[in-house]
Amino acid sequence: MMNEKHLQSLLICRLGGAALSEEAARELMEAWLAGEVPAALSGALLVAIAPLAITAGELAAMAKTLQEAAGAAPTGLPVLLDTCGTGGDGLGTFNISTAVAFVAAACGVPVAKHGARSASSRVGSADVLEHLGVHLSQERARVRAALDAVGITFLFAPGWHPALKAVAPVRRELGIRTVFNLLGPLVNPLVPTAQVLGVYHPSLVAPMAEALERLGRERFLVVHGGGGLDECSLTGPTALAGNLSGPICGSRLHPEELGLAAAPLEALAGGDVAENADILRRVLQGKGSRAQSEVVILNTAAALVAAGAAAGWMAGVTLARDCLADGAPWAKCEALIRFGNT
């Protein structure tokens, strides 16, 4: 058990601008999960460990601790993709990464989508999928079975990380982004081999990429899009960091180079849960607007490249466009809904 004096020393360390050691970060997460951190001190620590000043070492150590507490269960599949990002860009777009998960699955890539209800966006992935009929509160064995039967499964984060309830009240009272907003995409219990991970601020691209590498992701892309989007963007260039060709390297992606039309953020706007569900349905059926469809095509291309299912960006765009045109992604969504209700 971590005593209060030790916790205060960690707070003083972080307030002084120093990063926590990986061991200290692990111990702090264990104390949080055990409910051993007093509320006032917990709030102070969450403020001190500011997301935009966090290190990859702190992220990886906390993520490993969370994943171990959840009971990580690697599938053994040679390729398993997650499209979970940080959310939190505050732009109110429709659920792009959720759409991408179904398109990638329809392209033949096994997908384990980790997600939760809305935190800082209008509608979270869990909200929109539940509205469409996806059963969120399934036993773990059924969640895993869906992956084999359908090719895609959804892991409702609160059901896999119940220990996080200990810090939920403090997070709600603070009402700001904290380290826990960054940990969600890193702690999928099925341990994906590949990931495309959108972040809400450009300064998060490098530390999140390094954290993924420390956690053993075989292939990944971390992205921050033009206009502030936590996805690849049609509004401007997207900053990328990935390990697809060896060590992590950064680059910039321009949608026009892939034959995709520029579009304002307003063209990607979502609404309430019913509106977002309707947009998701139409996009997956191949009936979305040009901007809606092309932002999903662009981000699916990123997912396919990250998973090694496309030889390059243009090949990924072509695969995603063809898949979306025949409505196969909606058939995947319907299959997941049916599986959860049988």
From Swiss-Prot:
Keyword Coiled coil listed: no
Reactions it catalyzes: N-(5-phospho-beta-D-ribosyl)anthranilate + diphosphate = 5-phospho-alpha-D-ribose 1-diphosphate + anthranilate
Amino-acid positions noted as binding Mg(2+) 2 in the UniProt annotation, renumbered to this chain: D230, E231
Record family assignment: Belongs to the anthranilate phosphoribosyltransferase family.
Cofactor binding annotation: Binds 2 magnesium ions per monomer.
EC number, UniProt record: 2.4.2.18
Amino acids binding anthranilate 1: G85
Gene3D superfamilies cross-referenced by the UniProt entry: Nucleoside phosphorylase/phosphoribosyltransferase catalytic domain, Transferase, Pyrimidine Nucleoside Phosphorylase, Chain C
Subunit structure of this chain's protein: Homodimer.
Annotated residues for binding of 5-phospho-alpha-D-ribose 1-diphosphate: 85, 88-89, 93, 95-98, 113-121, 125
Entry GO MF terms: anthranilate phosphoribosyltransferase activity; magnesium ion binding
Protein source organism: Gloeobacter violaceus (strain ATCC 29082 / PCC 7421)
UniProt-recorded name of the protein: Anthranilate phosphoribosyltransferase
